[in-house]
Curated annotation (Swiss-Prot):
A motif (PPxY motif 1) lies at residues 180-183. Belongs to the PMEPA1 family. Interacts with PMEPA1. Interacts (via the SMAD interaction motif) with SMAD2 and SMAD3. Residues 16-48 form the LDL-receptor class A domain. GO terms for cellular component: early endosome membrane; Golgi membrane; intracellular membrane-bounded organelle; membrane. This is Low-density lipoprotein receptor class A domain-containing protein 4. It comes from the Eukaryota. The keyword Mitochondrion does not apply. One of its GO terms (biological process) is negative regulation of SMAD protein signal transduction. Functions as a negative regulator of TGF-beta signaling and thereby probably plays a role in cell proliferation, differentiation, apoptosis, motility, extracellular matrix production and immunosuppression. In the canonical TGF-beta pathway, ZFYVE9/SARA recruits the intracellular signal transducer and transcriptional modulators SMAD2 and SMAD3 to the TGF-beta receptor. Phosphorylated by the receptor, SMAD2 and SMAD3 then form a heteromeric complex with SMAD4 that translocates to the nucleus to regulate transcription. InterPro entries: LDL_receptor-like_sf, LDLR_class-A_CS, LDrepeatLR_classA_rpt, TMEPAI/LRAD4. The gene is LDLRAD4.
Length: 306
């Protein structure tokens, strides 16, 4: 019995594997069991069928480093987002608060800086370069120029605009019964004195179609100009046709037809008729024996000679 107990004790105390460090492994199952039982991993070096693995402490350190990097990145992104949101809300709130103050300051500054369109009773009308509004120096830093124009356009009147840019024809006051002349632009428009206008109105009176009157003025004008006969200076004279011997036939044309075909003939005719009338009176005084002069007036009849 004592011998059997001694053998069992030797079996448990017998060294099965001696590590490189001198440590003894009493169990054979501790060798090549994928665990570092020796402490220097010498019990796993000569294992042919089992792949060597690093100690588990290396994996734990790498995992902790990756977790630290991820946490730092997430915290940094959150801080940046929060700062951007706070800055945005701060700027929008400041602009919302300053907008009523700016509009009120602009309304108060309009009568102080000068009205864009002053009334005639307050001051004489300024030129185009003097009525432009110059913004205040402090407004240049509040908003860009296009935003200032957009905001300031609400206070500008829609009319009147700069009046030298509006090209309108001149206004002519006509009396009752007058026919306005055909407008052909400011270059060809001619204003007449009252005497010429009354004479032109008498010339435009339409005569009976069966009357034929000799007119020495028309003969002289036709021979001088060589063109179509202008309207007669006598009441009831036809100017539609003119023969070589000075006989006028047919109804006279209307004023609009004459002015449409010959816009400058009326004014030229008045000058020439006045010149011929003066020369005719002088010739009548010199040769008062047998001069034929047509009589103007309401009592004149065809064939009355002086």
């Amino acid at each position: 019995m004592p011998e059997a107990g001694f053998q069992a004790t030797n079996a448990f105390t017998e060294c099965k594997f001696t590590c490189t460090s001198g440590k003894c492994l009493y169990l054979g199952s501790l060798v090549c069991n994928q665990q570092n039982d020796c402490g220097d991993n010498s019990d796993e070096e000569n294992c042919l069928l089992v792949t060597e693995h690093p100690p588990p402490g290396i994996f734990n350190s790498e995992l902790e480093f990756a977790q630290i990097i991820i946490i730092v990145v997430v915290v940094t992104v959150m801080v940046v987002v929060i700062v951007c949101l706070l800055n945005h809300y701060k700027v929008s709130t400041r602009s919302f608060i300053n907008r009523p103050n700016q509009s009120r300051r602009r309304e108060d500054g309009l009568p102080q800086e000068g009205c864009l369109w002053p009334s005639d009773s307050a001051a004489p009308r300024l030129g185009a370069s003097e009525i432009m509004h110059a913004p205040r120096s402090r407004d240049r830093f509040t908003a860009p120029s296009f935003i200032q124009r957009d905001r300031f356009s609400r206070f500008q009147p829609t009319y009147p605009y700069v009046q030298h840019e509006i090209d309108l024809p001149p206004t002519i006051s006509l009396s009752d019964g007058e026919e306005p002349p055909p407008y052909q632009g400011p270059c060809t428009l001619q204003l007449r004195d009252p005497e010429q206008q009354m004479e032109l109105n008498r010339e435009s009176v339409r005569a009976p179609p069966n009357r034929t009157i000799f007119d020495s003025d028309l003969i002289d004008i036709a021979m001088y100009s060589g063109g179509p006969c202008p309207p007669s200076s006598n009441s009831g004279i036809s100017a539609s046709t003119c023969s070589s011997n000075g006989r006028m036939e047919g109804p006279p044309p209307t004023y609009s037809e004459v002015m449409g075909h010959h816009p400058g003939a009326s004014f030229l005719h008045h000058q020439r008729s006045n010149a011929h009338r003066g020369s005719r009176l002088q010739f009548q005084q010199n040769n008062a024996e047998s001069t034929i002069v047509p009589i103007k007036g309401k009592d004149r009849k065809p064939g009355n000679l002086v």
